[in-house]
């Protein structure tokens, strides 16, 4: 990457505001796109793609609105939508990257547009949780075959922070009590079979030159996986853990910490990401088009009997 571009982006990230004609601009009406994914099994009865409602609540709880991004959206519509929203969220899930080329084509297009926006001084954040975290790493490497297997489903642990965490954008604004909770209490919920190993990170220059590692964890078998990342020069962030689950999911077969400390710490991540999206000045030119795209046009279904992992699910066709 051109060194001048890197310097400019770094300054924007550090300052944390956008100036237009010398005036500081903050967008207090952010709209964030959440990517859908294909349904399978019993879920196909209700629609061909879905978003777990907990991700929507997670974004809304921090003061943003949500637009679903259909994973099979055409490139023209995606480009128009990306120019109107203020950030994108890649949720967790179970997509087989090697057998879902439409899905992977879409996340690659989103990634390319996010990088291009920011290279041009157009601040645009991207967040990935669980599978979304994995997607960020794989997209930076342009290789979907870098993940390792882990014994870390239904597994709630504290974070092992690296030396970079305290000075990172993601965690530098967190209170000492939140950092202490994250580091010492079992409040970060993991639910993944695959992950990014430190060895793969170290051996893959396209990943280790793009992302800093802010935390790691060890699975039940003693194998270390990377659990939090932050792009060095872009507003791109990822957690292998699920900050939305302790706040909004209640299945008693999943080990989730619903304590006050857990809620405060996990909610911090949403507050941080939405605040990043306030720095994006994209907007819809037509209010009626904006209204027609919002998640409010859809009704979530109570899903206890079909998919107990989620309290509610939004389905799409």
UniProtKB/Swiss-Prot annotation:
It is an enzyme of class 3 (hydrolase). Its EC number is 3.4.19.9. It catalyses: (6S)-5,6,7,8-tetrahydrofolyl-(gamma-L-Glu)(n) + (n-1) H2O = (6S)-5,6,7,8-tetrahydrofolate + (n-1) L-glutamate. GO terms for cellular component: extracellular space; vacuole. GO terms for biological process: tetrahydrofolylpolyglutamate metabolic process. The active site is at residues 130, 242. It holds the Pfam family Peptidase_C26. The keyword Hydrolase applies. Residues 1-22 form the signal peptide. GO terms for molecular function: gamma-glutamyl-peptidase activity; omega peptidase activity. Its main location: secreted. Residues 23-317 form the Gamma-glutamyl hydrolase domain. Transmembrane segments: none annotated. It is found in: Secreted, Extracellular space. Glycans are attached at residues 99, 154, 160, 257. This is Gamma-glutamyl hydrolase A. The lineage of its organism: Eukaryota, Amoebozoa, Evosea, Eumycetozoa, Dictyostelia. The gene is gghA.
